[in-house]
Amino acid sequence: MRLSPWGRVVAISALLVVGSLVALVTGGLASRERRVVSYPVTGALQSLAFDLDAGDITIVGGGKRDEVEVRRTERYAFGRVPRTAKIVSAGVFKVTSRCPTSMLARCAVAYRVVVPDNVALDIRTTSGNVTLRGYRGTAKLATSSGAIEIAGYCGNALDARAGEGAITLAAICAPPQTTLRTGSGDIAASLLAGRYDIDAESASGDEHVRGVIDDDSAPYSVQALSTSGDVTVEGTS
């Protein structure tokens, strides 16, 4: 079939657009880079504060160690390196990480942090998973989109909130105050068997409380709330 002059112009333009997109995607794949940075943070720290926009973070309890150990893994393309700032002020180690805005150049930053006991945590990520392992202390964890996984936790207060994502908790002691909230996702909390002041609710999902005693006068409180998802609070020996 012969094309009219206008049809040929449209066809050529479409081919040029497709070719440009293919070149951009191919170039992006070829230019992907990975960079790993590790460093210690020494001195008397009271707390850590991480504010990430795109990336996972894993916090590992370091027991009685004297320093914080940070490992940052960056992935990016077209040289669009994540912007990271860190500062120690008044006993607080603060880290902020932002990826440049781009439709084609994907960017992500992943952190692995080893932290001594009783250094408080304030961890926030816009898009990413938060993992806490073997930590003893007070922790606030939040992600807008991602899962929160907590294992081997023992501390005074735990506050974990996800906009969209599941929350799992395995505690090895009875924290005085535990708050678990998600807008969309399941909540599964495993606690030591005993008495707790429990508020376990789901607006759209099943609720299960087993192996623990719900007692309003108990010294330990547990709040597990999901807007859409199952909520399970259970005791283990």
What feature does the model see in each segment?
Residues 1-7:
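Terminal targeting segments of Actinobacterial cell-envelope proteins
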Residues 7-26:
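Hydrophobic membrane-insertion alpha-helices, especially the h-region
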Residues 31-33, 44, 77-81, 107, ...:
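Residues that act as N-cap/strand-start positions at coil-to-secondary-structure junctions
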Residues 53, 89-90, 126, 135, ...:
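Structural motif
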Residues 96-171, 175:
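Non-cytosolic head/periplasmic domains of membrane-anchored proteins
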Residues 151-237:
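Short, surface-exposed interaction patches in beta-rich subdomains
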